[in-house]
Structure formats: structure tokens, C-alpha cells
Regions:
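Auxiliary Fe-S-binding modules of radical SAM enzymes
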Residues: 1-89, 151, 248-256, 262-348
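Short linear Ser/Thr-Pro motifs
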Residues: 74, 107-108, 197, 219
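Exposed loop/turn and edge beta-strand positions of beta-sandwich/beta-sheet ligand-binding modules
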Residues: 77, 102, 155-158
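A short loop-to-beta-strand scaffold at the N-terminal edge of the catalytic core in hydrolase folds
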Residues: 90-95
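Canonical Radical SAM [4Fe-4S] cluster-binding loop centered on the CxxxCxxC motif
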Residues: 97-143
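Short beta->alpha linker loops
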Residues: 130, 200, 329-333
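Conserved AdoMet/S-adenosylmethionine-binding subsite of the radical SAM
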Residues: 144-324
């Protein structure tokens, strides 16, 4: 059966029209309000939509959310969910604490084809894309948990598409999910509160204008193609200069800016020459530089730099006119930090 969460408002209306259900668009809007405004799990009842629509949906669609297999809580209040879909495939989703509010770090694929060498997910390979409904239900599950267990911090969470997978490699399903997240009849989430992270998957990046006006984060990680290709093998196909040129062509409106993500790996990309070349290619660009200390995982060949070396790298950027922040690591004690998601890890 098709998940009700896989439908956009338009496709749900068409779905009901095929069976001559009365007032299909009105019924579709009521279903959307039920799922996303009221966030109720389960089918609607007679009086909300027609009996014919109820009977048809009962035979053709599922109103079930994905199954939560486990929930882990970090000492810093990060929360990691292991979520299972109807075919038995699993992903991890993370609630990340910020002052006054949380963000939900959502996965877009089971595994990932990019095989970035700093990322535990990359060792899993790609098993399949997630559907738009599987992307959406991660958010609903995390928000419901937040309301139950941390109600004082349960304001509508932000979204970061930074979990398992490359979002732009699963473009169509991510696009459908985003349209529901921001739509008036859907979750009504402001576009400024959604950030999509990419390793630089150029075919999807060139279509970025088709998406709602969300924020974008580029996994940069080195200003040199030779080193970046070692960290992100995708760079061999889509080199950095092509990615930056494409990003420069994206019309960022208002005060939106790109987030440049830079994982600091000791002895590989945290040298003085790395900082100086990074400043050279980013000077004058409208963006924010997030320096992310490498987070270890079983089998990793990299090391995390010392606090002193990270501060020195930041200082060089600052002296060259580049504002950069060092991101605070969250959830590393439960393997929920950047680059650590992989549900096959024992104990997840």
C-alpha cells in the first residue's frame, strides 16, 4: 500500500479524483491538515471526509508512520532515533539542541553513494533512496518525541538535511518533501529554517532553483582538488571550481547566504597553506564558514586536530578577512555527531 505521506496535495487530489470521491480537493486539504497541521496519526473519520474517500483510502493507502526501533539520549541533550521503514531498511535521525529550540537532522537515503572518507555513513554504500514520505515522517517522529519528553523545547524544530545520504542525489523525493514542509496546507515551515547540505552533487546543484528558497550548506573540506578528491571522491567528477561557479549563479535573496562546511582533519587539511588558499577562494563570497572538528568512528584513518591547531586555523582565516566559527560537537557519545551516522553500528 502507498504511504499517505508520499502524496503532495496535487497528487492526493488526483488520487481521490480517479475514484470519483466527492470534493477531492477539499478532502485532500482536510487530509493534509490532519497529517501536518494537527499531526494526527491514523485515517480520518466520517464527517471529516466522505465515506467513499475513507473506504478507498483504507484499501489503497497506509496512514502509518515509520517504526521507531530505538532512542538514544546524549549527555548534551542530543537525541538519536533509529527508524525502520516498511521494507525493513533503517536510518538514523537526530534531534540537535540549540538555545531555545531544536533542529531535526534528517536522512534522505539509506546509506550514501558519495563515500566521503571522513563519514561513517559512506562506508555503508547506498542501499536505496528514501521516499518523500519517509523523509517527512522522520521529522514528525522527532517532533512528537520532543513534545512528549521535552515540552518546554517543543517549538516547531528547524530542519537540516544533513543526515545519511546526499540530498541532491535523491532530488525528486527531496523536492516533494520540501514542498510539503513549506506549503500553506502542509507544515508551514519557513524556508529560512531549512538547510540542505550537499557534497557538491552537480546535477542536483544545477537544479537547486527548482526547490523552495531554503538555505544551502556545501561540504567544502579543502581548497585543493587533490586533497578534496581524497576526502570527497565525488570531486573527481565534479571539481571544486565547477561547484563554486554553480553556487555563484544561485540567486540568494534577502539575507540568505551559503554555509561552507569544513571538516578539520589533523595533518591533511588544517595546515597554514590550506587556510590561506581557502581564504583566497572564499574572499568576497556571501557566506558563513563552519569549521567542524573531525569526529572519529570505528576504522577511521583520520585524527581530530587539537583545540590549539583548530584555533590557529581559524585565526589565519580571520587575519585574511574570513569570518569562521568552530562548531561545537554534539552527540558524539552516542555516535550522533557530524559524520558518525551509520545504523549498522552495534548498540544503535
Amino acid at each position: 500500500m502507498e504511504s499517505i505521506y508520499n502524496f503532495t496535495l496535487e497528487t492526493l487530489t488526483q488520487h481521490l479524483q480517479t475514484q470519483d470521491c466527492p470534493h477531492p480537493k477539499t478532502a485532500a486539504i482536510r487530509i493534509f491538515h490532519h497529517l501536518y497541521r494537527e499531526r494526527k496519526v491514523g485515517p480520518l473519520t466520517e464527517g471529516q471526509i466522505s465515506k467513499k474517500a475513507i473506504n478507498y483510502l483504507a484499501k489503497s493507502t497506509s496512514f502509518d508512520l515509520a517504526k521507531t526501533i530505538s532512542v538514544q539520549e546524549s549527555k548534551d541533550f542530543t537525541v538519536k532515533f533509529l527508524i525502520e521503514f516498511c521494507d525493513g531498511e533503517r536510518v538514523e535521525t537526530v534531534l540537535i539542541p540549540f538555545p531555545g529550540r531544536y533542529a531535526v537532522c534528517i536522512s534522505t537515503q539509506v546509506g550514501c553513494a558519495m563515500r566521503c572518507s571522513f563519514c561513517f555513513t559512506g562506508t555503508q554504500g547506498l542501499k536505496r533512496h528514501l521516499t518523500s514520505g519517509e523523509i517527512l515522517t522522520q521529522y514528525l517522529i522527532a517532533w512528537e518525541w520532543l513534545e512528549c519528553y521535552r515540552p518546554r523545547k517543543a517549538a516547531q524544530p528547524k530542519i537540516v538535511l544533513m543526515g545519511q545520504g546526499e540530498p541532491l542525489h535523491n532530488f525528486e523525493e527531496v523536492k516533494k518533501a520540501l514542498l510539503i514542509f513549506v506549503s500553506e496546507q502542509g507544515m508551514q515551515l519557513g524556508t529560512r529554517r531549512i538547510t540542505l547540505s550537499t557534497a557538491g552533487y552537480l546535477p542536483g546543484l544545477k537544479r537547486f532553483g527548482e526547490l523552495p528558497l531554503i538555505n544551502i550548506a556545501l561540504s567544502l573540506h579543502s581548497p585543493f582538488n587533490s586533497i578534496r578528491s581524497q576526502i570527497i571522491p565525488l570531486n573527481k567528477s565534479y571539481p571544486l571550481e565547477d561547484i563554486l561557479a554553480t553556487i555563484d549563479s544561485i540567486p540568494f535573496k534577502g539575507n540568505r547566504a551559503i554555509n561552507f562546511e569544513y571538516v578539520l582533519i589533523d595533518g591533511l587539511n588544517n595546515r597554514e597553506e590550506d587556510a590561506r588558499e581557502l581564504a583566497k577562494i572564499l574572499l568576497g563570497k556571501k557566506g558563513i564558514i563552519n569549521l567542524i572538528p573531525f569526529n572519529g568512528f570505528p576504522g577511521a584513518v583520520y585524527e581530530r586536530p587539537s583545540e590549539e591547531r583548530m584555533a590557529a586555523f581559524q585565526g589565519i582565516l580571520s587575519s585574511l578577512g574570513i569570518h569562521a566559527t568552530i562548531r561545537t560537537t554534539k552527540g558524539s557519545d552516542i555516535f550522533a555527531a557530524c559524520g558518525q551516522l551509520k545504523h549498522l553500528l552495534e548498540g544503535s
